[in-house]
Curated annotation (Swiss-Prot):
Pfam families: ACT_7, CASTOR1_ACT-like, Castor1_N. It comes from the Eukaryota. The keyword Phosphoprotein applies. One of its GO terms (biological process) is negative regulation of TORC1 signaling. The gene is Castor1. This is Cytosolic arginine sensor for mTORC1 subunit 1. Residues 155-174 are annotated as: Disordered. It comes from Rattus norvegicus (Rat).
């Protein structure tokens, strides 16, 4: 397997909802006018709390500082895994759980995940790159993009100066929730983006109501606003709930032949921050053990895993039992 360290240097930001009006123009430019920006990595995710932005340095320049914009300190590098030179197409954070996610957690490397229709991006802090390479060099052929070309990276076999894998105190047990939304993971031909621009602007900037399908019901029958759009190296990926999808022309949105729907597992009771290690591993590991596919989207405050709709009960049961097991080990 190959691990590719891409050229993007990404900043992670939180845009408060009351400040959205201030950023409408630069966001529309990044969304719909990529030819007028040199930004090659753009991701915008709406959650109940805020909007999370992941943008490269060129995109970051488009966003003026304000009291509404919170910027994480670190610069993040972007990686993905490929087999025989082609990026893995399956919904696959679980496919890299053992080979990438778990080893990095054991070496205390904090990661963010951004799964898209096309691939799974792994984000690590720039300052952690040497540890990442050292940790994964035995498992992967590692390449770093320079000027658009992959250049082999050789890992130093010596362990001097690098932290050893540790199985110390049990990780923090973060609560999980499962909103009732049913989600679609879609793509769109960039040439047809203008045809959905009006609808996309309405959904992102003006529509914040709870989807109808779960507006009624018991206390557990709740939905959340969640919409993720990414435009990365010319490829578009969209995650939206099934109710929102009805607003878009059905002939322009592309999905897998199965048309599978996904349910969400939301991780975190309080904002997770960026320093804790192993959060993704806590979810990806148990799902990999039972071979459940998952998309995974990290945001500024919380993490989100999407699993096949017919697997949600099994997944919740597995994760809750794991949490109970960890909690019982605490003194």
């Amino acid at each position: 397997m190959e691990l590719h360290i891409l050229e993007h240097r990404v900043r992670v930001l939180s845009l408060a909802r009351p400040g959205l009006w201030l950023y409408t123009h630069p966001l529309i430019k990044l969304l719909f006018l990529p030819s007028r920006s040199r930004c090659k990595f753009f991701s915008l995710t709406e959650t109940p709390e805020d909007y999370t932005l992941m943008v490269d340095e060129e995109g970051f320049k488009e966003l003026p500082p304000s009291e509404f914009l919170q910027v994480a300190e670190a610069t993040w590098l972007v990686m993905n895994v490929s087999h025989s030179g082609s990026v893995v197409q399956a919904a696959g954070v679980t496919k890299i759980a053992r080979s990438v996610i778990a080893p990095l957690a054991e070496h205390h490397v904090s990661v963010l995940m951004l799964s898209t229709y096309q691939t799974d991006f792994i984000l690590v802090r720039e300052q952690d790159l040497s540890v990442v390479i050292h940790t994964l060099a035995r498992e992967f052929q590692i390449y770093r993009e320079v000027g658009g070309e992959p250049v082999p990276v050789t890992g130093d076999d010596s362990s001097n100066g690098f932290p050893q894998a540790q199985h110390g105190p049990s990780p923090t047990v973060h609560p999980i929730q499962s909103p009732q939304n049913r989600f679609c993971v879609l793509t769109l031909d960039p040439e047809t983006l203008p045809a959905v621009a009006t609808t996309l602007i309405d959904v992102l900037f003006y529509s914040h109501s709870v989807p109808k399908e779960a507006a009624s019901g018991g206390p557990e029958s709740t939905s959340i606003p969640f919409f993720a759009f990414s435009l990365i190296e010319g490829y578009i990926s969209i995650v939206m709930d099934a109710e929102t999808q009805k607003k878009f022309p059905s002939d322009l949105l592309l999905t897998s032949s199965s048309g599978e729907l996904w349910r969400m597992v939301r991780i975190g009771g309080q904002p997770l921050g960026f320093d804790e290690c192993g959060i993704v591993a806590q979810i990806a590991g148990p799902l990999a053990a039972v071979d459940v596919s998952a998309y995974y989207i990290s945001t500024f405050n919380f993490d989100h895993a999407l699993v096949p709709e017919d697997e949600i009960s099994c997944v919740i049961d597995i994760l809750q039992r794991r949490q109970e097991g960890l909690a019982s080990k605490d003194p």
